[in-house]
Design a protein with these regions (language model features):
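A bilobed periplasmic-binding-protein/Venus flytrap-type ligand-binding module shared by bacterial periplasmic
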Residues: 144-151, 188-189, 257-269, 288-289
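Extracytoplasmic ligand-binding site segments that recognize negatively charged/polar headgroups
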Residues: 45-58, 70-87, 91-225
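Periplasmic-binding protein-like
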Residues: 126, 140-143, 169-179, 201-204, 210-211, 280-302, ...
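Extracellular/periplasmic bilobal clamshell ligand-binding domains
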Residues: 303-338
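A ligand-binding cleft/hinge motif common to bilobed small-molecule-binding domains
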Residues: 102-108, 222, 226-246
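Short, polar/charged alpha-helical segment
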Residues: 28-43, 47-68, 145, 239
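Short amphipathic alpha-helical coupling segments at ligand-binding clamshell hinges
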Residues: 57, 199-202, 259, 268-280, ...
């Protein structure tokens, strides 16, 4: 009896220890929900360009709270200009914005955002991804290497970013343009920080073929026109399922962009905005992201993630862009990759 009791106590203590660090989803504040429902709607500004998993996240909010979401979904550069124009004219239409972290920091510095007033589910964020009183992480876009499995044998697959320097890949690397904003520039910055300029000089000597037509370039690799492509968005790889391609996660880790959310200055529906941002840190939305090949910012979602997505969502993060060095990095890329 005593032994059984001791074992039971030990098991309960172990279970309690396992739960430490995994903060449960926070209960909705009934006053916030009531105020948000009274506002009835919100305007959401983003640049995911119709990706179905993003639409699913929006619909989950509308279904749960009965609050409609008016969506502005345009390219990042167009989005930034839209906000500048509206706010300069004193027309405050948008409530919530979601964009890359570096761009969001610029928006905050330019006075385009305001404090969100508290997000209960921010307590759930992983230790590496922290919220501020203005910016709240929502998900992570990560990049690896795409290879054509018919052209590249298993033993020849690049396991490291440095494997791209192998002479066998000369004139055979299809790459997003590192000299312009986008995935290529993110990769350039992160690998410059990790390996230094000599790495890029050697990679430039491989004569990578630059392009900015992401969807078509992925298909070119699938067709066998090129054996590999860098950098490859994790989430885009899911679209290529059934084709002779494979995503490689290099041993050093992967470049990434974190997408943050914030309330726009003088948001006309501030309570709905807070509730919306909070919803994006719920299990429901984080699992939508995880099962689409994005990395969630809330840990311990565990068994609900599809088996084929677990390697992607648990990939080691190598680094991301720095808003204060972004322009210098772009200039350096143009200098090295002529």
């Amino acid at each position: 009896m005593i032994r059984i009791g001791l074992r039971l106590i030990a098991a309960m203590m172990a279970l309690g220890a396992m739960s430490v660090g995994a903060t449960a989803q926070q209960a909705d504040d009934p006053d916030l929900v009531a105020a948000a429902k009274k506002e009835g709607k919100l305007a959401f500004y983003t640049s995911f360009l119709g990706a179905p998993f993003h639409i699913a996240a929006i619909k989950s909010f509308e279904k749960k709270y009965g609050i409609s979401v008016e969506l502005l979904d345009v390219r990042a550069s167009e989005l930034r200009e839209r906000i500048r124009t509206e706010q300069a004219a004193g027309r405050f239409i948008g409530d919530v914005i979601q964009n890359g972290a570096a761009t969001m920091i610029r928006s905050q510095r330019d006075g385009e955002l305001e404090p969100h007033g508290g997000i209960a589910n921010a307590k759930r964020l992983s230790g590496e991804q922290k919220a501020t009183d203005v910016l709240v992480p929502s998900y992570i876009l990560a990049y690896g290497i795409l290879v054509n499995t018919a052209k590249v044998k298993g033993e020849d697959e690049p396991k490291s970013w440095k494997d791209l320097l192998d002479p066998a890949w000369k004139d055979k690397i299809l790459s997003d343009d590192m000299r312009a904003l986008g995935g290529g520039q993110v990769m350039f910055s992160v690998l410059e920080d990790a390996f230094g300029r000599p790495f890029h000089e050697k990679l430039a000597a491989q004569q990578p073929i630059f392009s900015r037509d992401v969807g078509n370039d992925e298909r070119r690799v699938a067709r066998g026109e090129y054996p590999l492509r860098i950098p490859q968005l994790f989430s885009n790889t899911t679209i290529l399922k059934g084709l002779p391609v494979k995503l490689i996660i290099p041993v050093e880790g992967v470049p990434y962009i974190r997408f943050d959310m914030a309330r726009l200055r003088n948001a006309p529906h501030p309570n709905a905005a807070r509730l919306f941002i909070n919803h994006y840190l719920s299990d429901e939305v984080q699992l939508i992201y995880a099962n689409a090949g994005l990395i969630p910012v809330v840990p311990d979602l565990g068994g609900a993630i599809k088996e084929e997505m677990r390697a992607l969502t648990s990939a080691k993060l190598l680094g991301t862009t720095n808003v204060d060095t972004q322009d210098a990095m772009m200039a350096l890329a143009r200098e090295i990759y002529k």
